[in-house]
Amino acid sequence: MAHVVVMGAGLGGMPMAYEMKAELTKEDRITVVGNGSTFHFVPSNPWVAVNWRKREDIEFPAAPYLEKKGIAYDPRGVKRVHPERNQLELNDGTTMDYDFLVIATGPKLAFDEVEGLGPHGNTHSVCHVDHAVKAGQAWQGFCQDPG
């Protein structure tokens, strides 16, 4: 019996877990490890940024949908990978063993690479729903007072 862990619960990790579940044996286990309990549908972030959608329209709890297919969900997030031990160190200090690991964590944003870019600069991002909400607030402010 193998334990497959999918690190990341976004647009890569969630479909990967569903597809792997269909291919593995009934004895094999799959666990998805995400940062928090909520799945965000990233392709709709631009709609949040222009206030055509609200955050709650594009997010839902991940665990119930995965569990319905027999996939475990852990919202604690990964702090470190220990490949020599086939083990993850979770953000709360506990560990999780795996036989196979899929890394589907998405991008690491590097706003500091370009001067003036990002939330502390002169631009707005829609890469994460938190960014899209802030961009929507800025857009609303601009619409009310375009200068």
Where are these regions (language model features)?
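Rossmann-like dinucleotide/flavin-binding elements
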Residues: 1-30, 109-113, 119-120, 125-147
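Beta1-alpha1 glycine-rich phosphate/pyrophosphate-binding loop at the start
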Residues: 2-72, 117
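Glycine-rich nucleotide phosphate-binding loop and flanking beta-alpha elements
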Residues: 13, 80, 96, 108-109
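A conserved short coil-to-beta-strand element within the FAD-binding core of flavoproteins
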Residues: 74-86
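Short, well-ordered coil/turn residues at beta-beta hairpins
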Residues: 91, 104-105, 113
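Core beta-strand elements of the Rossmann-like FAD/NAD(P) dinucleotide-binding domain
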Residues: 91-100
